[in-house]
């Protein structure tokens, strides 16, 4: 299926852009192209600055490594201070002793908290967000929203969603993908 043909788009730095579209419109594929985790069949993608992996994405964590080991691994990939990121994620994700247990033993909520903590512990110029879903109890949701809003004071974001309301709340620009 062709997702974009002859497409040219500019996402300005420091701006939160929302992409709205129905299922199958190509929103997530476009995010993968921007992230560099997928290649276009023709043409090219030009990015400037540090672009995040999709915020909260836990799919690349190794199931047999602990939360701390996975965090250390990601820190090394991104050239971050490993000790600082581990301390940040341990405090932020509220995993207690589970942070030192294999990732495969985590509940879905624990996996999401670890992934979101790692995402927020790394500084990017642009954050990529594919269908934000709030995880955890009310206190964790509030803490997550606050830290994310803090990040957006110094960075931009590209959001994809089905939810018009969510995009209106978080974005300063937008487009509809057909």
Which functions belong to the PLM regions below?
Residues 50-146:
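ABC-family P-loop ATPase nucleotide-binding domains
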Residues 170-178:
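H-loop (His-switch) and adjacent beta-strand-loop-beta switch element
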Residues 13-76:
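ABC ATPase nucleotide-binding domain signature region
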Residues 38, 133, 175:
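Conserved catalytic/dimer-interface elements of ABC ATPase nucleotide-binding domains
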Residues 147-162:
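Conserved catalytic loops of ABC-family nucleotide-binding domains
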Residues 4-6:
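Conserved structural motif at the start of ABC-family nucleotide-binding domains
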């Amino acid at each position: 299926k062709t997702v974009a043909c002859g497409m040219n788009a500019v996402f300005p730095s420091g701006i939160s852009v929302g992409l709205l579209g129905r299922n199958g419109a190509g929103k997530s594929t476009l995010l993968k192209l921007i992230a560099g985790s997928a290649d276009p069949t023709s043409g090219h993608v030009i990015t400037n600055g540090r672009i995040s992996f999709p915020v909260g994405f836990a799919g690349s964590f190794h199931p047999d490594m602990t939360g701390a080991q996975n965090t250390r691994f990601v820190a090394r990939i991104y050239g971050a201070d490993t000790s600082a990121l581990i301390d940040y994620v341990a405090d932020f994700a509220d995993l207690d002793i589970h942070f030192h247990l294999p990732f495969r033993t985590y509940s879905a909520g624990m996996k999401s908290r670890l992934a979101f903590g790692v995402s927020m512990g790394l500084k990017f110029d642009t954050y990529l967000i594919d269908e934000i879903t709030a995880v955890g109890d009310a206190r964790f949701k509030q803490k997550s929203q606050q830290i994310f809003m803090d990040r957006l004071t110094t960075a931009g974001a590209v959001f994809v969603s089905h939810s018009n309301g969510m995009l209106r709340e978080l974005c300063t620009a937008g487009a509809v993908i057909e």
